[in-house]
C-alpha cells in the first residue's frame, strides 16, 4: 500500500493532469487516510470507515484520468467500473456484486506477483538445476567417487555457460506442467459461484498433467522459473493476503454514475433498472459481505469514488440513501483555452511530444511553436463553445486533423523539418472551425 503524503500524491497527479486541484486534494487525502487508518490499533481501526467521494464535472476535464493515475499510485487493489454496465437483480446483465468479485481477482493477481517476485531467486536456482539435469543427467549410484567428481566439475562448467547466456539458443526437451484449460461457463444471474467452482474443478483436473516440450534454453528457463515459483509460494496464504488487502485497502471507482440517475421531473418509462442499480449499490457502499470464489469479503472499509458529468441530471437525483453514502463532493471545473495550452505542453508525454516522437520514427522532424500551440488551444476551445463541450478530448480530434496529411505522407518526407506555427494551424483548421456544421461532423 502506498505511504505517499497528500502533497506527494498531488505532485504526482500534477505531472499528468492539468488543474482540478480540489479533486486532486480530495483523492490524495482519501488515499492517505487509508494509510493512517492502518497505523491505528485494531479496535479503533474497525470504527474508522472511509469517506466516499463523488466527483462532479463536465466530460473531458480529468475525472477518469484521475482514477487511472490513482490506480498506479495506490499500490492497493483498485478497480474502475462503468455504472451503465450493471442491472438490478432479476434483469439480464451484470450484478453489482461482480465488482467485488473482480476486485478480489485483481488482488489475487497482485499478491501472487508480489509473492512470486519474493521467491524469484529460489525459483531461478531450482530452474537452473532442472536445466542442468536435462543437459547432464545425474550419475547413477554405484559409480566411483572420481566419476562423480568429474560430473560435478562438468556441471559447474555448464552452469557458468548457462549464466553467461552461451547456451540460450540450444534446444532441449523437458517435462512442463500442462497449461490450464480455459473454460468459460455462462450462468444465469445469481449463480456465478457455481460457475466459478466448476471452472476451478476443470482447471484442477488439468493442472496435474505434464507435457514433453522442446524449447530453447532461454525460453525453458522462463517457463521453469514460473513453475518453480508457483510450487514455492503458499496458495492459501496468497488467498488470505488478497482478501485482507481488498477488505482493508480496496478502492472502487464507479464512473458514469449520473447515467443511472432518473430525473426528478421525468415521468415513468425508460430504463426501469436504473434506480434498482442504485439500490443494489447501497449495501456494497454501506458495508456488506459478498461471496466470492476466494472466500467471503466484507466491504465495510472499501473506499468508493463515484464520478459523473451530471449534464442531464443533478447529484440530488441520486436516491437519498446513496447521496448520504457519498459525503465528500468535489466539483471539477470546465477547461479554458489557457488550460488547453498547458495540456499540450506541461504533462509528461503530452500530446505534442507524442506526435513529435511518432513522426520522428519516419525521419520527419516536427516542432510546435508557442503561437501554433496557442492557435490549436483557441480552436479547440472555440469548437467546444459552439458545439458540444467534450473538454480536453477535443484536442485529440484537432491534433489528428492537423497532422493527418503529414502522417499519411511521412515516408516521402523523411529528412524534412516541419514547423507547426499559427499560420499552419489557421490554414488547416480555420474553415472547419468557422463552419459550425463542419465542426459538428468533423471535429
UniProtKB/Swiss-Prot annotation:
Annotated compartments: Cytoplasm
Entry keyword annotation includes 4Fe-4S: no
**Major location, coarse class?**
cytoplasm
InterPro entries, alphabetically? AAA+_ATPase, ATP-dep_Clp_protease_ClpX, ATPase_AAA_core, Clp_ATPase_C, HslU, P-loop_NTPase
GO CC terms in record: HslUV protease complex
- Which HAMAP family does the record match to this protein? HslU
- Can you say what this protein is called? ATP-dependent protease ATPase subunit HslU
* Organism (species): Colwellia psychrerythraea (strain 34H / ATCC BAA-681)
Amino acid at each position: 500500500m502506498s505511504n505517499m503524503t497528500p502533497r506527494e500524491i498531488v505532485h504526482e497527479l500534477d505531472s499528468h493532469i492539468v488543474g482540478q486541484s480540489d479533486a486532486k486534494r480530495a483523492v490524495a487525502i482519501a488515499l492517505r487516510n487509508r494509510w493512517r487508518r492502518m497505523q491505528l490499533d485494531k479496535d479503533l481501526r474497525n470504527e474508522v470507515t472511509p469517506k466516499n467521494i463523488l466527483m462532479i464535472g463536465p466530460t473531458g476535464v480529468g475525472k477518469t484520468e484521475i482514477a487511472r493515475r490513482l490506480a498506479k499510485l495506490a499500490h492497493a487493489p483498485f478497480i474502475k467500473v462503468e455504472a451503465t454496465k450493471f442491472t438490478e437483480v432479476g434483469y439480464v446483465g451484470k450484478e453489482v456484486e461482480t465488482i467485488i468479485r473482480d476486485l478480489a481477482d485483481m488482488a489475487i493477481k497482485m499478491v501472487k506477483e508480489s509473492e512470486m517476485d519474493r521467491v524469484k531467486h529460489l525459483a531461478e536456482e531450482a530452474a537452473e538445476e532442472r536445466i542442468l539435469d536435462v543437459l547432464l543427467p545425474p550419475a547413477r549410484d554405484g559409480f566411483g567417487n572420481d566419476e562423480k567428481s568429474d560430473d560435478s566439475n562438468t556441471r559447474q562448467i555448464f552452469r557458468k555457460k548457462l549464466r553467461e547466456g552461451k547456451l540460450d539458443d540450444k534446444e532441449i526437451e523437458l517435462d512442463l506442467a500442462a497449461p490450464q484449460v480455459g473454460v468459460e461457463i455462462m450462468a444465469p444471474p445469481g449463480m456465478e459461484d457455481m460457475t466459478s467452482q466448476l471452472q476451478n474443478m476443470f482447471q484442477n483436473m488439468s493442472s496435474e498433467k505434464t507435457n514433453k516440450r522442446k524449447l530453447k534454453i532461454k525460453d525453458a528457463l522462463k517457463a521453469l522459473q514460473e513453475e518453480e515459483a508457483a510450487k514455492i509460494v503458499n496458495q492459501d496464504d496468497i488467498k488470505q493476503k488478497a482478501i485482507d488487502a481488498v477488505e482493508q485497502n480496496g478502492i472502487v471507482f464507479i464512473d458514469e454514475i449520473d447515467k443511472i440517475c432518473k430525473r426528478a421531473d421525468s415521468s415513468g418509462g425508460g430504463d426501469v433498472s436504473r434506480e434498482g442499480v442504485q439500490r443494489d449499490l447501497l449495501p456494497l457502499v454501506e458495508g456488506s459481505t459478498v461471496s466470492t470464489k476466494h472466500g467471503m469479503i466484507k466491504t465495510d472499509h472499501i473506499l468508493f469514488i463515484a464520478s459523473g458529468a451530471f449534464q442531464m441530471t443533478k447529484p440530488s437525483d441520486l436516491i437519498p440513501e446513496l447521496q448520504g453514502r457519498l459525503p465528500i463532493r468535489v466539483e471539477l471545473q470546465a477547461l479554458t483555452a489557457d488550460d488547453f495550452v498547458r495540456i499540450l505542453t506541461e504533462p509528461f508525454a503530452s500530446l505534442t511530444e507524442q506526435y513529435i516522437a511518432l513522426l520522428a520514427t519516419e525521419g520527419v522532424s516536427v516542432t510546435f511553436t508557442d503561437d501554433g500551440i496557442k492557435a490549436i488551444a483557441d480552436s479547440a476551445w472555440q469548437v467546444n463553445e459552439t458545439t458540444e463541450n467534450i473538454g480536453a478530448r477535443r484536442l485529440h480530434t484537432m491534433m489528428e486533423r492537423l497532422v493527418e496529411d503529414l502522417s499519411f505522407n511521412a515516408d516521402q518526407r523523411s529528412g524534412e523539418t516541419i514547423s507547426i506555427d499559427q499560420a499552419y494551424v489557421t490554414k488547416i483548421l480555420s474553415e472547419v472551425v468557422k463552419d459550425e456544421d463542419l465542426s459538428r461532423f468533423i471535429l
